Regions:
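Active-site core of glycosidic bond-cleaving carbohydrate-active enzymes
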Residues: 1-62, 66-201
């Protein structure tokens, strides 16, 4: 029984540096969100002159690294014993993720794009991974949801590969091209999103 606020699986997160699955539902999403929240706490503590607290939380903000699966080049999930979950499937929704798949949550490192780039092998491999997201077949495995949730239907309707603008963890990914030196791709994909999803009404 947990409250409606706080951190589900915090005991694991503090001990292991990640929230494990299947012990905790949506564990990878929670790990990535906690890491970003820790970075925010660090920035706040630093602004108050509490550098000891800031340093502690800057270190915790690196916990996203614990769930990057280098063999596949995506965020994935581990159990409490540190074992990677088998049967890797980047198109699987639910399970360790919230309303998305590994394709979407891999980019949920808002506070450290350079660190994520390093995990991927540098800017060039990161560009290649971004490029592949927009051209990959928009197939899906609805996973633990057991049916097509509206975010899946929206991704398919958008028809921009595995990019799912209907869910927050990946919405910023288009702007990563600006960060890694290919701003024309940001412009191209943004125009595509604007034309398909927005109007003056």
């Amino acid at each position: 029984e947990i409250a409606s606020v706080g951190r589900d699986g915090f005991e694991y997160y503090d001990k292991l540096g990640y929230v494990p699955y299947p012990e905790v539902p949506e564990a990878t999403a929670k790990t990535l969100e906690y890491a970003y929240a820790d970075w925010c706490i660090a920035r706040f503590a630093q602004s108050l002159g509490k550098q000891d607290i800031a340093d502690q939380y800057y270190q915790k903000a690196q916990n996203y690294r614990n769930l990057y699966y280098p063999e596949h080049g995506f965020m994935w999930t581990k159990d409490a014993k540190g074992n990677w979950r088998d049967r890797f499937d980047a198109t699987e929704w639910g399970g360790p993720f919230t309303e998305g798949s590994s394709w979407h949550w891999t980019w949920s490192v808002f506070h450290d794009p350079e660190g994520l780039s390093e995990l991927m092998g540098g800017h060039e491999p990161m560009v290649a991974r971004l490029d592949s997201m927009f051209v990959a077949p928009n197939t899906y495995n609805y996973g633990t949801y057991g049916f097509v949730i509206h975010e899946i239907a929206e991704m398919v309707a958008l028809n921009m590969g595995q990019y799912a603008h209907g869910n927050q963890p990946v919405q910023h990914a288009i702007y990563l091209y600006d960060y890694i030196g290919q701003p024309w791709k940001t412009q191209y994909h943004l125009r595509n999103v604007m034309d398909k999803l927005y109007n003056s009404g």
